[in-house]
Amino acid sequence: MRLLGRLFFIIRKFRKKKQLLRSDLGMYDVIIIGAGVSGAATARELSRYKVKACVIEKEEDVCCGTSKANSAIVHAGYDAAEGSLMAKLNVKGNQMMEQLSKDLDFPFKKNGSLVVCLHEEDMPNLQALYDRGVANGVKELRILNCKELKEMEPNISDQAYAALYAPTAGIVCPFNLNIAMAENANVNGVEFKFDTEVTDLKPIDEG
């Protein structure tokens, strides 16, 4: 990978309420800002290559932001707009999760998901989700009628009219996933700097 430019990072260090410091972190091929699940996953992927990479996190550990407070659902991919990057990554990430859980030893359960429709007039919305999912490449999507839905989930409301069933959806432990990704990236050579906040980016001439 060719280094296209240099970035000087102005950072703030938080160490027991000490005075704010300004520091140059040095030269890297890639700087990743944030050690949440997206940052950790990016770091792990980059650790496969001959790239000098560093993850900068303003908190004291990984998984201290949005990644610690989410629904833990591994979505099937029917909700993202057709043809979007989100749709592509959602479906691909879903397909990767089972093997990742085995490789990195974090809990994952493929238990499927249901989008329940309570009224017949809502069926066009359910059908739209189904069509979008098929277009996005989601496998095994089905629309269940009320009888099929009751057989699958006896505790569902009697008002349920139909449901979109996505068997490829699942749940994961977001903490263990984030930590496992970061640990693996670090073992493979990616550096992590905590208690460090990026406050500005200034491009400078290479030379």
Segments and roles (model prediction):
Residues 57, 110, 145, 194-196:
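Short loop/edge segments at beta-strand edges and connector loops
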Residues 72-152, 161:
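Dinucleotide-binding Rossmann-like beta1-alpha1 core, especially the glycine-rich loop
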Residues 164-207:
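Helical element adjacent to the flavin cofactor pocket in flavoenzyme catalytic cores
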